């Protein structure tokens, strides 16, 4: 049953297509007169006159129907035996004339003469003459008075069949018989082409050859005329079958109008399309309209042409008439077959880019590639500012607005907007469930067999014209080998400076480096006089100093919250940042607190040095001021308090760690180092009365944590000697020693 249903659909489709083709053929027949002036109407009725006026003021009238008696008479005349009855019959038969038709004056379009056939009465007596002597001419002359100066004179020369005489019909209907002397020369080259033609024995006076001529924009153009010479073998008019002329009433096929040096083309008024034929232009104009007259009787879809409808019907019936000669595949359209052979068999890429070496199988891909040179993005998104070079990417982008996800994972049923995203999902999430195809030439593993075929064709196929490495002179005939070779140049510093030891991997880096030697700064600011070696520096300068809307980027330290304008500065700070709690920085760096303390010490150092230079010395003869001796010692850092003991014993304290003493105390850099503070005491000897100077070294107790009971004494000690002077108790104790 299914087979019968398919056959019924096929028969119905063929009947439908044939009906469409007949209607289309009839419409083309009716409108084909405008396409070519030399084409004659295909359907005529017996005895009917078809006159077609297409911007023409001259029409040629010829005999449509030949009487059978006339054909028989013509044969007898050629053989030399003509019966009197036949002569009488010919007297009352037909005559071929050329009549002037007065038309309305309008510009004459070149090459738009039409031949039509009408029956006319014939009253011409025939004498016993040969065929050669009956060669005549029809002259259709239009007086110059009736035409404008720009309109051409048209002359048409034809050979006469036997049994006819040439007459001239005037504008008012008067008939004038042409004499033999007025006939055109017999040596026209167009007559000599006929194999049955024999040159006349008697030479006649030579006159100018009569041709159909017209003028186009001041240039004379020759036009070939119709040739109606007789053929003895078939007894027909030249180049026309007599049975078709008499039975079907179809006129002979005209020759094409040939213009010397002029090629007529038709151009679309709506775009830049050009074509050599009017029918092609008419078919193209349908692409600018929404007219789709051809509808499918199965699904209702409409198409512009019958060819598109036929291809569509093949999709219903499953017919694939176009078979590939190189494999077993078949296609619905011829375009699909051509594209298949180029991709699979011939690898031909006829569409080449004029700006680079790119070549493509399809012209649409070439147009898309050319937009990469011009930067044109004609396909604009109506919802945002996105623009694309082709419609495919625009459709893919529109899914981000619509939320459509047409691609579904067959394992977990997750949906995606792009097929590539779905493939990556399958490879990453469902690797154990995916069939793996290993490339036999490399280590590549591919999930789909079709993708493996693409990989083999692109990476491992043999290239007849080898490709050269862009880094060296090596040539490879395989793309994969070329890529692997170029990877060996990736980390190679091939560009070396000829003025220093600098080397780099990229040429652009070397160009920028050489500007440090030459001092060249080609990038100048348009708002000030600054120049730069790199364009990035110019852009940064312009944004920072000349752009009022510029907001500098803030790089915040994650430890202390401090902001920086440059990332590398922030990274350098973060390596040694102590954080908000004052914890020592990483990699053994100084803490934030210690850095600030050091800055304060350096400031106080400068102040002390300036004060010491400006201060005047004020020293007594007997003693020296030792004020700095007490204050120079830095305050000891707090240490954990030990457990108190009931009876503390003086114990020599351990030396403080080196880490606790950093830097030099302020105001002591230019002074000589003093080991211990000293004091001069004058003592008078009671026996002799001499005065002796005793130098006393003040030994300061090392810093130690006092006990709880000794805190008050330690705090009161500085009050006794605020300036560091020796008290009397100290002097007496030293004298006792």
UniProtKB/Swiss-Prot annotation:
Keywords of the record: Acetylation, Activator, Centromere, Chromatin regulator, Chromosome, Chromosome partition, DNA-binding, Isopeptide bond, Metal-binding, Nucleus, Phosphoprotein, Repeat, Repressor, Transcription, Transcription regulation, Tumor suppressor, Ubl conjugation, Zinc, Zinc-finger
Compositional bias segments (type: Acidic residues): 610-636, 704-714
Gene Ontology cellular component terms for the protein in this record: chromosome, centromeric region; condensed chromosome; dense fibrillar component; granular component; male germ cell nucleus; nucleolus; nucleoplasm; nucleus
Compositionally biased residues, Polar residues: 668-687
Region ranges (Disordered): 180-211, 573-687, 699-727
Listed PROSITE patterns: ZINC_FINGER_C2H2_1, ZINC_FINGER_C2H2_2
Subcellular location: Nucleus, Nucleoplasm; Chromosome; Chromosome, Centromere
Basic residues composition bias: residue spans: 202-211, 593-604
UniProt cross-references to InterPro entries, sorted A to Z: Zinc_finger (IPR050331), Znf-C2H2_CTCF (IPR056438), Znf_C2H2_sf (IPR036236), Znf_C2H2_type (IPR013087)
Chief subcellular location: nucleus
Gene Ontology MF term list: chromatin binding; chromatin insulator sequence binding; chromatin loop anchoring activity; cis-regulatory region sequence-specific DNA binding; DNA binding; DNA-binding transcription factor activity; DNA-binding transcription factor binding; DNA-binding transcription repressor activity, RNA polymerase II-specific
Covalent cross-link Glycyl lysine isopeptide (Lys-Gly) (interchain with G-Cter in SUMO2), where: 18, 219, 699
Cross-link (Glycyl lysine isopeptide (Lys-Gly) (interchain with G-Cter in SUMO)): 74, 699
Entry-annotated residues carrying Phosphothreonine: 289, 317, 374
PANTHER family linked to this entry: GASTRULA ZINC FINGER PROTEIN XLCGF49.1-LIKE-RELATED, PR DOMAIN ZINC FINGER PROTEIN
Task performed by this protein: Chromatin binding factor that binds to DNA sequence specific sites and regulates the 3D structure of chromatin. Binds together strands of DNA, thus forming chromatin loops, and anchors DNA to cellular structures, such as the nuclear lamina. Defines the boundaries between active and heterochromatic DNA via binding to chromatin insulators, thereby preventing interaction between promoter and nearby enhancers and silencers. Plays a critical role in the epigenetic regulation. Participates in the allele-specific gene expression at the imprinted IGF2/H19 gene locus.
Subunit description: Interacts with CHD8. Interacts with LLPH. Interacts with CENPE. Interacts with BRD2; promoting BRD2 recruitment to chromatin.
Protein name from the UniProt record: Transcriptional repressor CTCF
Gene, per the UniProt record: Ctcf
């Amino acid at each position: 049953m299914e087979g019968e249903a398919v056959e019924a659909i096929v028969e119905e489709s063929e009947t439908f297509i044939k009906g469409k083709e007949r209607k289309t053929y009839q419409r083309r027949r009716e409108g084909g007169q405008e396409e070519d002036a030399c084409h004659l109407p295909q359907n005529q009725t017996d005895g009917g006159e078809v006159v077609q006026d297409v911007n023409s003021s001259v029409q040629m009238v010829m005999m449509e129907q030949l009487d059978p008696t006339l054909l028989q008479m013509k044969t007898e005349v050629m053989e030399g035996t003509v019966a009197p009855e036949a002569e009488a019959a010919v007297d009352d038969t037909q005559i071929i004339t050329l009549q002037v038709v007065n038309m309305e004056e309008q510009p004459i379009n070149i090459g738009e003469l039409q031949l039509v056939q009408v029956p006319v009465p014939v009253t011409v007596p025939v004498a016993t003459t040969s065929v050669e002597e009956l060669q005549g001419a029809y002259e259709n002359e239009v007086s110059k008075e009736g035409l404008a100066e720009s309109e051409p004179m048209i002359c048409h020369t034809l050979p006469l069949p036997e049994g006819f005489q040439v007459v001239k019909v005037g504008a008012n209907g008067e008939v004038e018989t042409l004499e033999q002397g007025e006939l055109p020369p017999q040596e026209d080259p167009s007559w000599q082409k006929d194999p049955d033609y024999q040159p006349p024995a008697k030479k006649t006076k030579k006159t100018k050859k009569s041709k159909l001529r017209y003028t186009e924009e001041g240039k004379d153009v020759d036009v070939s005329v119709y040739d109606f010479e007789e053929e003895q073998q078939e007894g027909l008019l030249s180049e026309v079958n007599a049975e078709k002329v008499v039975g079907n009433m179809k006129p002979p096929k005209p020759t094409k109008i040939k213009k010397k040096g002029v090629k007529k083309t038709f151009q679309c008024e709506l775009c830049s399309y050009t074509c050599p034929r009017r029918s092609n232009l008419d078919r193209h104009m349908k692409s600018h309209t929404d007219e789709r007259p051809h509808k499918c009787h199965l699904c209702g879809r409409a198409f512009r042409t019958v060819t598109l409808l036929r291809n569509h019907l093949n999709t219903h019936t499953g017919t694939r008439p176009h078979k590939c000669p190189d494999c077993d595949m078949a296609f619905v359209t011829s375009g699909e077959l051509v594209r298949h052979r180029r991709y699979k068999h011939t690898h031909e890429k006829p569409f080449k880019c004029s700006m680079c070496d790119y070549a493509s199988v399809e012209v649409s891909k070439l147009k898309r590639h050319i937009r990469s040179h011009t930067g044109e993005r004609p396909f604009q998104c109506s919802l945002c500012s996105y623009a694309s070079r082709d419609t495919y990417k625009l459709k893919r982008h529109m899914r981000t607005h619509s939320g459509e996800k047409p691609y579904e994972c067959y394992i977990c049923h997750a949906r995606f907007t792009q097929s590539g995203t779905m493939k990556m999902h399958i490879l990453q999430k469902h690797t154990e469930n995916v069939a793996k195809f290993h490339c036999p030439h490399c280590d590549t593993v591919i999930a789909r067999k079709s993708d493996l075929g693409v990989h083999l064709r692109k990476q491992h196929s043999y290239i007849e014209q080898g490709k050269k490495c862009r880094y060296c002179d090596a040539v490879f005939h395989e793309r994969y080998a070329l890529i692997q070779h170029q990877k060996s140049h990736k980390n190679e510093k091939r560009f070396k400076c000829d003025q220093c030891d600098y080397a780099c991997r990229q040429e652009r880096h070397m160009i920028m480096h050489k500007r440090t030697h030459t001092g060249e700064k080609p990038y100048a600011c348009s708002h000030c006089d600054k120049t730069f070696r790199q364009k990035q520096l110019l852009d940064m300068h312009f944004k920072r100093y000349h752009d009022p809307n510029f907001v500098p980027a803030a790089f915040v330290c994650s430890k202390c919250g401090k902001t920086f304008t440059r990332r590398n500065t922030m990274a350098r700070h973060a390596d040694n940042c102590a954080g908000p709690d004052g914890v020592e920085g990483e990699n053994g760096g100084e803490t934030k607190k210690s850095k600030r303390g050091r800055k304060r010490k350096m400031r106080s150092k400068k102040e002390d040095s300036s004060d010491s230079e400006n201060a005047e010395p004020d020293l007594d003869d007997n003693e020296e001021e030792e004020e700095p001796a007490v204050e120079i010692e830095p305050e000891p850092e707090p240490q954990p308090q030990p457990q108190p003991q009931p009876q503390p014993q003086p114990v020599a304290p351990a030396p403080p760690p080196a880490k606790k003493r950093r830097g030099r105390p302020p105001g002591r850099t230019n002074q000589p180092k003093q080991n211990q503070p000293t004091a001069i005491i004058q003592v008078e000897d009671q026996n002799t009365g001499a005065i002796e100077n005793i130098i006393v070294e003040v030994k300061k107790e090392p810093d130690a944590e006092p006990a709880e009971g000794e805190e008050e004494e330690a705090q009161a000690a500085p009050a006794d000697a605020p300036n560091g002077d020796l008290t009397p108790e100290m002097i007496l104790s030293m004298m006792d020693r």
